[in-house]
């Protein structure tokens, strides 16, 4: 299932008409503007087809963006990764591109103030507006403009063939891979919730799909690249209820949930919980909502709190991400097993690539298909963990580049190919980037590649005291680049789920990141190590492995941690400028390749693959 809107047959005039149709709806609703974010009711990173409304309305296919339509104007905000793409896709639609972060670009509130007169009313879909986004969008709006959730979703009327809710079946994630039962995880969630000030009962509504899947040891298929399912989860001090489409659940899963102490109800039945609280018959209750709660849910429970003194409402950070971030021993072993399978597929692919490039027949799209096919041959393969980024030459310098039939470059036997890919297996998730030399390189390409490699190695080698955060660790990857006048704009590392989302928090490694100071690294946390340098219009370099933080002894100065590199795949040695590496960096690279060779050789049946691996992991 690939949830992409087929828009290849549409013209800019079609999107102009869709915007005009929304304007007609606005007049009927007595609204002056409507906000269309890139969100679903669960604040998901990847959206089910049904909620790709911004893309349907505007024709802009980037993963980040927000559209606002008024009775006379329309605008779309996106970040620097998508400026060029948005400019091309919005041409002729009448939608103005707002380049976030650029001088002179107003934010949404400023634009609405300048566009709407006094008494203007801005509408939005309450289900598809998180509290976090609402606060950031409208905090600067004056009282002369009103903002309210609309009672009706315009896309139910305008999008005539709008997809239904996905209804893929659920599956169990075995405890042998999870390491903890659902019952044990529910108990951990309860223990992590704030204590009630008195004798009140506690009630927590979970709306993040990856948190629900992790807590219940269940997986689904409602969202591309993520083994998730649409649901809410209610957790009280002594019970739990899963709100989801009952047709997703087989008798096996229903019996399993009953054993774990979880009842099942319809997807939107959480609304009855809010209504029951409003009656005052439930008794004194502390209702905790996560910071990612959507505005429709927040309003429903706010009404309950306003209706009776028995209900106290508080929005809190979800207790689940810190629990999920520390992997159990079973999860760690599962991730190691997934890396072995993925490494074998990568070796087969890289050997094939070396043979194919000189023939001049392969493109960015064709190599993606080949790599996916090789991964699919591995036991327990469940699908890709994100859309593959295969960027040859100048395309490697484009953030989040995704090749299409129109843009896919043909690979030539020279220059660099940046390949960022990953997969889900039944026991774990992978995320790996390799930059590969396809032929002769310039001195600049070799220098940049080696600087990225140095940063990658220095983070992988880091030993650090307990309590160290990702903000502090970020310098390990960037310091050498900074000395040469290079840098990169994205984060250095993110958590990785266990057959869950490839992007997982709350920890991360990133500069200029206040949130990174709040969550120190701990034994059992996974994180990517992915520094890069991107030379605009020429080439890009990124090298990425997944790391596992582990205890590394104690000294008079406290307990220390270090990283185990989980990813097992050769790092291309052909672009390396050895003279730029220190002796310690060379020793790390040789030792890593020894590990890769010993681990992967037994998994390869093809003699040519074995020979390629031996050569690719030679000492330098």
Please report, for each region that a protein language model flagged, where it lies by residue.
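Active-site neighborhoods and metal-handling regions in enzymes and metal-associated proteins
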Residues: 2-620
């Amino acid at each position: 299932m690939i949830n992409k809107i087929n828009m290849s047959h549409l013209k800019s005039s079609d999107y102009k008409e869709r915007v005009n149709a929304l304007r007609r709806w606005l007049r009927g609703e007595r609204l002056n503007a409507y906000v269309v974010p890139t969100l679903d009711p669960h604040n998901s990173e990847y959206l089910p087809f049904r909620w790709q409304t911004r893309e349907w309305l505007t024709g802009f296919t980037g993963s980040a963006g927000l559209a606002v339509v008024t009775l006379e104007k329309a605008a779309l905000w996106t970040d620097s990764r998508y400026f060029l793409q948005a400019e091309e896709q919005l041409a002729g639609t009448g939608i103005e591109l707002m380049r976030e972060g650029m001088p002179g670009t107003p934010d949404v509130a400023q634009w609405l103030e300048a566009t709407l007169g006094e008494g203007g009313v801005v509408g939005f879909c309450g289900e598809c507006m998180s509290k976090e986004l609402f606060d950031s969008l409208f905090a600067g709006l004056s009282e002369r403009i009103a903002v309210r959730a609309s009672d009706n979703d315009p896309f139910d009327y305008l999008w005539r063939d709008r997809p239904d809710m996905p209804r893929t079946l659920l599956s169990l994630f075995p405890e042998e891979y999870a390491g903890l039962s659902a019952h044990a995880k529910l108990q951990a969630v309860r223990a992590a919730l704030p204590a009630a000030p008195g004798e009140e009962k506690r009630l927590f509504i979970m709306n993040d799909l990856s948190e629900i899947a992790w807590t219940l040891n269940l997986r689904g298929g409602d969202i591309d690249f993520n083994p998730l399912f649409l649901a809410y989860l209610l957790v009280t001090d002594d019970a739990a209820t899963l709100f989801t489409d009952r047709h997703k659940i087989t008798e096996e899963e229903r019996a399993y949930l009953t054993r774990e102490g979880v009842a099942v109800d319809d997807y939107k039945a959480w609304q009855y919980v809010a209504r029951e609280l409003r009656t005052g018959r439930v008794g004194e209750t502390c209702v905790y909502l996560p910071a990612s709660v959507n505005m429709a849910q927040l309003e429903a429970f706010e009404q309950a709190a306003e209706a009776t003194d028995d209900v106290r409402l508080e929005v809190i950070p979800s207790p689940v991400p810190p629990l999920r971030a520390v992997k159990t021993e079973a999860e760690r072993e599962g991730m190691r097993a997934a890396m072995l399978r993925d490494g074998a597929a990568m070796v087969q692919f890289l050997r094939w690539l070396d043979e194919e490039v000189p023939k001049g027949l392969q493109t960015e799209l064709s190599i993606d298909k080949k790599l996916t096919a090789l991964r699919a041959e591995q036991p327990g393969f469940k699908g890709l963990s994100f859309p593959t980024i295969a960027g040859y030459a100048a395309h490697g310098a484009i953030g989040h580049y995704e090749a299409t039939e129109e843009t896919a470059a043909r690979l030539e036997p020279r220059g660099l190919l940046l390949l960022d890919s990953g997969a889900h297996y039944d026991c774990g998730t992978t995320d790996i980037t390799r930059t590969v030399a396809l032929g002769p390189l310039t001195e600049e390409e070799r220098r940049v590649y080696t600087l990225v490699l140095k940063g990658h190695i220095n983070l992988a080698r880091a030993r650090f005291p307990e309590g160290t955060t990702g903000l502090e660790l970020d310098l390990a990857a960037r310091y050498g680049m900074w000395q040469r006048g290079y840098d990169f704009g994205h984060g250095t590392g993110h958590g990785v789920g266990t057959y869950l989302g490839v992007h997982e928090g709350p920890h991360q490694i990133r500069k200029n990141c206040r949130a990174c100071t709040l969550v120190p690294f701990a034994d059992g946390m996974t994180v990517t190590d992915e520094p890069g340098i991107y030379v605009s219009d020429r080439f890009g370099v990124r090298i990425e492995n997944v790391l596992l933080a582990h205890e590394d002894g104690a000294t008079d100065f406290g307990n220390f941690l270090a990283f185990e590199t989980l990813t097992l795949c050769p790092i291309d040695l052909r672009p390396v400028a050895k003279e730029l590496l220190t002796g310690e960096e060379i020793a790390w690279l040789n030792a890593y390749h020894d590990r890769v060779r010993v681990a992967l050789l037994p998994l390869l049946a093809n003699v040519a693959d074995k020979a390629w691996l031996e050569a690719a992991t030679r000492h330098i």
